[in-house]
């Protein structure tokens, strides 16, 4: 008797009996192919597409904060005055982690109270030699000469302001107060603010670096952008690096820029002084409390009321941190974009600042810096906004901590890797292989 409804006998197909184990062998081959593809996938540059996973909280002891060591321009853990003090790793020059990255604790920033010819030749090679710490008393170059001796309780770390009096507002005092501020110039004209994070590296926003056939230079140690000073240096830019995920527009309107960050590598390193000093980068896992008072510094809009630029000398303005959810809600009402679309994402941070026309910094990448126990951290860089005349809309800064791994990868000289496919695509590909294996 034939099977009901012409059903095939198990183990046989319309063309005859199946070969035992053929389907299983084909499935195994497909799975091996999938494993090979996963092994060959290029590594994703950290900090460009995904948010780094937060490390677990540790109440006791608190993990050390990660800081720039100005003498070398590399990441290292070290001590600082006050409650942020940590233990230095054993032995001089010890790097943290496999690539020199040290674990960072949760930094909760509290509320705060309120012309000479520029040298264009590279400095002496001995001056440019990398420095290393010697115990806790001083620094030496690679030749063994003592360059500077410091007290053990006053080690020279990043984020040190060299002007303690906040009432002084003259240009020279402003340079000492914000020694990491540099002017990024294209073909001799100021276009954006930059932030010194190492002797040969400047951080800025990507939308200032999108021009072609431009000669970039960086002016450091000067409060003016239209003249030099005895403390200033103009250094040509050797290399421009823009985050490969940068998008000038995230949506169909003016709202938002994505991954608006870039790096400038200088042709030679700057010599540190009280007018030239790097700022600290916050750790991967840190918190800036809502309503905390921070500072925006820079030169403002490059062209205001027909006058270029808005300010010739360095300016500063205090702003307060705005809750991200409130900021996102405001922009949904302001732009009429669907509430299903998230406008303010984890790579952004909002600030409350009224009367921005007086100091309009919306398109020139001015930094947002916050102080904790006397140490200054680069929290954000001005990315986008609706315009300084619409002061009711908060300015949106790129959140620097999100891009800390990307910055370190570029500074450590790792090759630029292609972005890896998302987990969703990998899962879909795996399901497709399983379906093919059952045929």
UniProtKB/Swiss-Prot annotation:
Residues 437-439 are cytoplasmic. It holds the Pfam family Trypsin. Residues 1-47 form the signal peptide. Disulfide bonds join 192-208, 294-370, 327-350, 360-388. The chain crosses the membrane at residues 416-436. Keywords: Disulfide bond, Glycoprotein, Hydrolase, Membrane, Protease, Signal, Threonine protease, Transmembrane, Transmembrane helix. Belongs to the peptidase S1 family. This is Probable threonine protease PRSS50.
């Amino acid at each position: 008797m034939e099977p009901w409804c012409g059903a095939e006998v198990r183990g046989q197909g319309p063309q005859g009996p199946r070969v035992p184990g053929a389907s299983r062998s084909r499935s195994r081959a497909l799975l091996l192919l999938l494993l090979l593809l996963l092994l060959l996938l290029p590594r994703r540059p950290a900090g460009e597409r995904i948010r780094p996973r937060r490390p677990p909280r540790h109440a006791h002891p608190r993990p050390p904060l990660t800081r720039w060591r100005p003498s070398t321009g590399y990441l290292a853990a070290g001590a600082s005055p006050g409650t942020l003090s940590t233990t230095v790793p054993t032995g001089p020059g010890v790097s943290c982690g496999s690539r020199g990255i040290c674990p960072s604790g949760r930094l909760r920033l509290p509320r705060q109270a309120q012309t000479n010819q520029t040298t264009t030749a590279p400095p002496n090679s001995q001056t440019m030699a990398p420095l290393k710490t010697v115990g806790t008393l001083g620094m030496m170059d690679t030749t063994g000469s003592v360059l500077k001796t410091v007290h053990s309780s006053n080690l020279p770390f990043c984020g040190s302001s060299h002007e303690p009096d906040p009432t002084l507002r003259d240009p020279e005092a402003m340079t000492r107060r914000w020694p990491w501020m540099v002017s990024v110039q294209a073909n001799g004209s100021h276009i954006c603010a930059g932030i010194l994070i190492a002797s040969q590296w400047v951080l800025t926003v990507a939308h200032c670096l999108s021009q072609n056939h431009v000669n970039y230079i960086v002016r450091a140690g000067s409060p003016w952008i239209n003249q030099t000073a005895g403390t200033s240096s103009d250094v040509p830019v050797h290399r421009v690096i823009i985050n490969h995920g940068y998008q000038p527009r995230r949506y169909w309107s003016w709202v938002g820029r994505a991954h608006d960050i870039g790096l400038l590598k200088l042709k030679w390193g700057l010599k540190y002084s009280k007018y030239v000093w790097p700022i600290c980068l916050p750790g991967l896992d840190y918190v800036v409390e809502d309503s905390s008072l921070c500072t925006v510094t820079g030169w403002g809009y490059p062209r205001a009321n027909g006058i270029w630029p808005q300010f010739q000398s360095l300016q500063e303005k205090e702003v307060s941190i705005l809750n991200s959810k409130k900021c996102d809600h405001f922009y949904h009402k302001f732009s009429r974009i669907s509430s299903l679309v998230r406008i303010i994402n984890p790579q952004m941070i909002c600030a409350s600042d009224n009367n921005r026309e007086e100091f309009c910094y919306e398109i020139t990448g001015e930094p947002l810096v916050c102080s904790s126990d006397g140490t200054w951290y680069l929290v954000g860089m001005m990315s986008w906004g609706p315009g300084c005349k619409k002061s009711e809309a908060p300015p949106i800064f790129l959140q620097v901590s999100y891009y800390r791994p990307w910055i370190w990868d570029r500074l450590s000289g790792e090759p630029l890797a292609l972005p890896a496919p998302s987990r969703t695509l990998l899962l879909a590909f795996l399901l497709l292989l399983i379906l093919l294996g059952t045929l």
